[in-house]
Structures are given as structure tokens and as C-alpha cells.
């Protein structure tokens, strides 16, 4: 159980904070702090799940990014070329003038898939990224 609370400061774009405030109100949180604690717990849980990605996997990485960010499109292409042995397909959609949505379909070693996803997630200009995988040998 968490006992000691630490005060931190966070800088956010106003549109992101407005959306977060809407969610807090709809979910009935008593404060932004409670919403942030819940979001951090969810992030930690997802990160721990990513640590368990082992063996042969199939999955996707979904990414929304600002293609006007200098060097980002090239960095994404470099990552995809480096991990081309894992990539089976990709779909690229222009959302608006600045933003693109890309889904990359993957098949291969789970640890390498995780490396690819983390390389994409760490790039400046990536606004959203989500890795989803399943063990390819599971009986469905």
C-alpha cells in the first residue's frame, strides 16, 4: 500500500489536460491526482506485461505521430528496415495535415518485437503507440 505521497509537477499541452479533465469528471475521480495515479498504475501494468513478451509472437504496433517533426519519418523508416524480418505488413493513414496513423503487423521473436515497439515509443513526435501481441502457438 502506498503510504507517502510525493508532490510532482508535470507540463502538459492544454488539449491533453482538457481531455484528461473530461475523463476524470466522467469517471468520478475526486481529483486530478487520483486520475494521474490510476493512469500511472495502468502504465506500469502495461510495461510489466511487455516484460513478459517471450517466444514466438504475432501482433501489431499502432502508432500516431506528427510527420512534420523533423527526422521522425526517417527514424521510423530506419527502425522498420532494421526489423524488416519481423514485419509482415503495414498500413499508413493520413489523419490530417500533420498526423499519421500507422499499424505494423509483426510475426517473430517476442523480445525483438518488444525492442521494435520500444524503439518507436521512444521517438519524439510519437503521440501514441500501443503494442499488442499473442503467442502464435496458442490454440484458438
Curated annotation (Swiss-Prot):
GO terms for molecular function: DNA binding; DNA-binding transcription factor activity; nickel cation binding. InterPro entries: Acetolactate_synth/TF_NikR_C, ACT-like_dom_sf, Arc_rbn_hlx_hlx, CopG, CopG/NikR_regulator, Ni_resp_reg_NikR, Ribbon_hlx_hlx, TF_NikR_Ni-bd_C. Its cofactor is Ni(2+). PANTHER family: NICKEL-RESPONSIVE REGULATOR (PTHR34719:SF2). This is Putative nickel-responsive regulator 2. Belongs to the transcriptional regulatory CopG/NikR family. One of its GO terms (biological process) is response to nickel cation. Transcriptional regulator. The lineage of its organism: Archaea, Methanobacteriati, Methanobacteriota, Stenosarchaea group, Methanomicrobia. HAMAP family: NikR. Keywords: DNA-binding, Metal-binding, Nickel, Transcription, Transcription regulation. Binds 1 nickel ion per subunit. The keyword DNA-binding applies. Ni(2+) binds at residues 81, 92, 94, 100.
Amino acid at each position: 500500500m502506498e503510504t507517502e505521497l510525493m508532490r510532482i509537477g508535470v507540463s502538459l499541452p492544454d488539449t491533453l489536460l482538457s481531455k484528461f479533465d473530461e475523463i476524470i469528471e466522467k469517471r468520478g475521480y475526486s481529483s486530478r491526482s487520483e486520475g494521474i495515479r490510476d493512469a500511472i498504475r495502468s502504465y506500469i501494468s502495461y510495461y510489466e506485461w511487455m516484460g513478459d513478451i517471450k517466444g514466438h509472437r504475432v501482433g501489431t504496433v499502432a502508432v500516431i505521430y506528427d510527420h512534420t517533426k523533423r527526422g521522425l519519418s526517417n527514424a521510423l523508416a530506419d527502425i522498420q528496415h532494421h526489423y524488416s524480418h519481423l514485419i509482415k505488413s503495414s498500413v499508413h493513414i493520413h489523419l490530417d495535415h500533420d498526423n499519421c496513423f500507422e499499424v505494423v503487423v509483426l510475426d517473430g521473436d517476442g523480445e525483438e518485437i518488444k525492442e521494435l515497439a520500444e524503439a518507436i515509443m521512444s521517438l519524439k513526435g510519437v503521440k501514441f503507440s500501443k503494442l499488442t501481441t499473442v503467442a502464435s502457438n496458442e490454440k484458438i
